[in-house]
Design a protein with these regions (language model features):
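A generic fold-level signal
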Residues: 6, 73-76, 100-103, 129, ...
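Acidic, glycine-rich loop-and-strand cores that form catalytic or ligand-binding grooves
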Residues: 71-85
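Non-heme Fe(II)/2-oxoglutarate
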Residues: 1-73, 179
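Histidine-centered catalytic micro-motifs
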Residues: 89-97
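Short, conserved beta-strand element in jelly-roll/cupin
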Residues: 81-85, 98-116, 161-164
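Short beta-strand or tight-loop elements
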Residues: 77, 88-90, 104, 143
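Catalytic core of Fe(II)/2-oxoglutarate
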Residues: 104, 115-182
Length: 182
């Protein structure tokens, strides 16, 4: 477990308290609601803890690969919380699809709820949706993945990406979190 259970429960509550301000992403390939936590002051207290969860885990990669090719500074894309209602989904895709997302090099999902059906499925494996657990993977081909639909209860996840450099798509600098040169 990478994030404490009570911390996950608190994030779900914070999302639900602001759900009317969430953005519904509903197309033929996905159906979920999301919030960018940087847009809400009430998330300021938890943002640091979320980043710490991610930095701690990515530190294992950074230690192993720093002399080979790991970027010296961690630049996180703005953190989003997503809610998939029963039947919600994100069909097969990759998270680097062109110029606007090409600087992403690692994807992070932290599962905020337990959900037997709401797995993250890759072509040859699947990751269970277990509260407090995290999955990290490259966001480009061939790590094609999908968010399987929860059946009985909503699925909540936190997501972000590490970037090689400044955002190609023009997000304001205040929305970016930068950590260390260690």
């Amino acid at each position: 477990m990478f994030c404490p259970i009570l911390f996950c429960d608190n994030l779900v509550k914070l999302f639900d308290d602001e759900v009317e301000l969430s953005v519904l992403r509903q197309t033929s390939i996905h159906n979920f609601s999301e919030l960018h936590i940087e847009q809400f002051d009430k998330f300021d207290k938890v943002k640091g803890s979320l980043i710490n969860c991610m930095v701690e885990k990515v530190g294992l990669y950074k230690t192993q690969f720093k002399d080979i090719c790991f970027p010296p500074t961690l630049k996180f894309e703005p953190i989003k919380i997503k809610r998939y209602l029963p039947g919600g989904y994100f069909d097969w895709h990759v998270d680097v699809t062109g110029h606007t997302s090409m600087s992403r090099y690692l994807a992070f999902f932290i599962y905020l709820t337990d959900n037997e059906e709401g797995k993250t499925r890759f072509l040859n494996t699947a990751v269970d949706c277990k509260k407090g657990s995290m999955v990290i993977f490259p966001p480009m081909w061939p790590w094609v993945h999908r968010g399987e639909p929860p059946i009985e209860t909503p699925k909540y996840i936190v997501g972000s990406y590490l970037h090689y450099n400044s955002p190609a798509w023009g997000a304001p600098n205040y929305m970016w979190s930068e950590y260390g040169r260690n």
